[in-house]
Amino acid sequence: MTIFVRIKQKPLPMKRILIAAVTLAIAFAPATLAQRPGGPRPGAKPDTEKKDEPEKPAPELKVTAGLFGVAQHEKDWYFDIPDSLLGRRILAVTRFVKHTPGASEYGGEMVSNRMIYWEKAINGNLLLRIDPNVIHSEEGDEIDLAVKASSENPIVASLKPEKTASPGCTRVKVTSLFEGDNQPFSLSAASKRSYNLGGLKGDASFIQSIRTYPINTEVTTTKTFTYNAPTPSAPGPAARGNTLPAGTQAGVVTLVLNTSMILLPEKPMQPRWFDPRVGYFADGYTEFSDEQQAVERIRFITRWRLEARPEDVEKQKRGELVEPIKPIVYYIDPATPKQWRPYLIAGVNDWQKAFEQAGWKNAIRAEEWPEDNPDMSMEDARFSVIRYLASSTANAYGPNVHDPRSGEILESHIGWYHNVMTLVHDWYQVQVGAVDPRARKMKYDDELMGDLIRFVSSHEVGHTLGLRHNMGSSSFTPVEKLRDKEWVEKHGHTVSIMDYARFNYVAQPEDGIGKDGLYPRINTYDKWAIEYGYKPTDFKTPKEDHLYWNKVIIDRLNAQPELWFGGEGSDSDPRAQREDSATTPSRPATTAS
C-alpha cells in the first residue's frame, strides 16, 4: 500500500526570489542586449590602454660598400651581408687599441682571434657562429654523420633581419653585437678574471667607428668594465690578479678595442704537413674517415703564402730567383724612436738571403709606417707591424695570425718592449765585455745598441715566419773554433739565429775576433728551415708533398748533421740547452781560460 504524505513547505522570502530572477535574466540575455550602445564589445581592452601605433618608415641609409656593407643611422649601425658570404669563413682578430695603465698588456697587442661565419636560421634570423675547426671528416663517409652530430658550432648572436635590405643580401642591426660583451669582440672570461673586471657598463661602452674595405671590416669600440679591487689578505684569484690604478681610483676600467674581420680564402692554401725534424710552429685538427683503423691527427706548419706569377713559374723551376706576387711586408710602428728604426728594418731584410735558398727574390722587407695614409690602420689585420710598446718588460716576442684550416700566415704584430735594450745591454756586457771595449759602458752608443736591436729583430721575425727556437744549433760548433778568428767570423758561433746562444763568450782579447764572430746571424739552419717551409712544389695533395720532403730531409741531415733541430722541450738532451755554446757545453769555460 502506498502512503502519500504531504509535506508542508515554508514559503521563500521575496528577496531571494528577486535575486534568482535577475541572475537568470542576465545569464540568458542575448549578446546584442548585453552590449551597451556605443560601448566596447565584450572582451575588448579598456579605452585607457595605448592603441598600436603605425610602424615607422625605415630610415634611408647611406651604405658604404666593402666586405660587409656598413651604414649608420643616429646611434645604430647596420651590416649588409651578401648571400654569397653565408657560410664563408672569416677571421675576427681583436686587438687592444688603448689599454689601462698598470696592465701587463699594451695597446697594439692581440686579445683574441676566432674563425666566424654567418648562417640563415630556420626562423629567418641571421646567425653568427664560431668554427673551432677541431674535427674533420669527408663528405659522403658514413662516419661523417657521427662527426656532424659531435661538432655543433656555437651561436654567438641571432640577429633579426631588417626589411630594407637590397636583393641578395641581409641587413641586420649590429649595435648591440659590438657594444655588448660578446666574447669574440671583447675580453674572455679568463682575461677579465685576471684583471679583476666585473660586468660591462653599457652607458660607458660604445662603438667609435666602423670602416669597411673589400676583404675586411674594422670595428673600433670603447668598453668600460666595473672593477673588483683585489683584497691582499683574501685568498683566491682576485687576490692574485693585477692591481690596476684606474680601477682602484675610479672603480671602473676603460679599454679601446679593434676587431678586424678579414675574409679567408674560399679555397684554403694547400698545407705543408708538419715534420718534427724541422722546427716550425704547427696547427691542425682530428681527421675521421671510413677507411681508418686509427684516428689521425693532421698537423701542418704555419707559413706565409708565396706565389710566383704565371710567367715566372718555369723560371723558378729552372733555379732562377723570382719575386712573389705578394711579398711579406712589415711596417715599423711610428711610436718607435727614430734612431732604432733602420736597425729594426735591417733585421727584417736580413731574411731575404734565406728566402733565396727557397727560390725567392725580395720575398720580405720592412718599411716605415706611411703616416699620411688614412686608409691604413695598425690594428687592421691586412698589415704586419713591429709594435713599439711602452713597457718596463725586458723582452720582445714574435707571434702570427694564421688561417686555422691551412696554416697560412695572414699577418703578424711583433711586440717590441722598450726595455728590451736593458736585456741586450747586459748580455753583451757580461759575455763580450772582455773583447769589445764598447761593451764596458753603462750606456751604449747608437751603433752598438742598433746592432743588438737588429739581432733581436731578426730572431723575432723568424718566429713570425713560423720558426721555433732551435736550442740545438750551437751544439754543432767545434769548441776550438770559437777562438779561431778566420773560422768563426766566416761561419758564426751558432748555425741558427733561432738559438738561445746569444754571443760568443769564449772569445778572448788576444784572438782579435770582430763582431762577425761575436754576434749571432741568420745562418745555415735558418736557410734550410726557410727552404723546407717556402720552396714550392707541384704536388696535388699534402700527402704527396710530405713524402717528397721526407726524402729531402733524410738526405739533407745525412749530408749536413748541423741542420739537426733541437727545440723547446728537449731539455733532457744535452745538445739542446739554453745559453750554451759549442759541441761540448762543459768545455768553453776551459777553452776561454
Question: What function would you assign to each model-found segment?
Answer:
Residues R36-T336, A354, A358, A363, ...:
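Auxiliary tRNA-acceptor-end handling modules of aminoacyl-tRNA synthetases
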Residues Y397, H402, E408-W416, S457-L465, ...:
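Extended catalytic-interface subdomain
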Residues G43-K45, E368-L389, D451-S458, G462-Q508:
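The catalytic-center signature of Zn2+-dependent metalloproteases
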Residues N349-W360, G462-H463, L467, F503:
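Sec-exported extracytoplasmic/periplasmic mature domains
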Residues A21-F28:
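Bacterial N-terminal signal peptides
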Residues S474-S593:
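Conserved catalytic/binding loops enriched for acidic/polar residues
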Residues F28-A34:
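Sec/Tat signal peptide C-region and signal peptidase I cleavage site
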Residues I7-A20:
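Bacterial N-terminal signal peptides that target proteins for export
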